[in-house]
Each structure stands twice: as structure tokens, then as C-alpha cells.
Curated annotation (Swiss-Prot):
Reported tissue expression: Expressed by the venom duct.
Modified residues (Histidine amide): 32
Keywords: Amidation, Bromination, Disulfide bond, Hydroxylation, Secreted, Toxin
GO MF annotations in UniProt: toxin activity
This protein's domain notes: The cysteine framework is XIII (C-C-C-CC-C-C-C).
Record's protein name: Conotoxin de13a
Length: 34
């Protein structure tokens, strides 16, 4: 999981962390958003 949540939300509702792009409708190194 990422140490912090970032405002970037992927198509699947995950929150992308700073420096981690959305990949294949998922996020790399991220936590689930609301």
C-alpha cells in the first residue's frame, strides 16, 4: 500500500499515488479509493 493517498483517481476507483501512473485500468503501488 502507498504511504499516502493522492487525488488522482483511476477508472476503477483506485487512488494513484504521486509518481505512479494508472496502468491497465488499475494503479501501480496504490490503495483502494472510496
Amino acid at each position: 500500500d502507498c504511504p499516502t493517498r493522492c487525488p488522482t483517481t483511476c477508472a476503477n476507483g483506485w487512488e494513484c499515488c504521486k509518481g505512479y501512473p494508472c496502468v491497465n485500468k488499475a494503479c501501480s503501488g496504490c490503495t483502494h479509493g472510496k
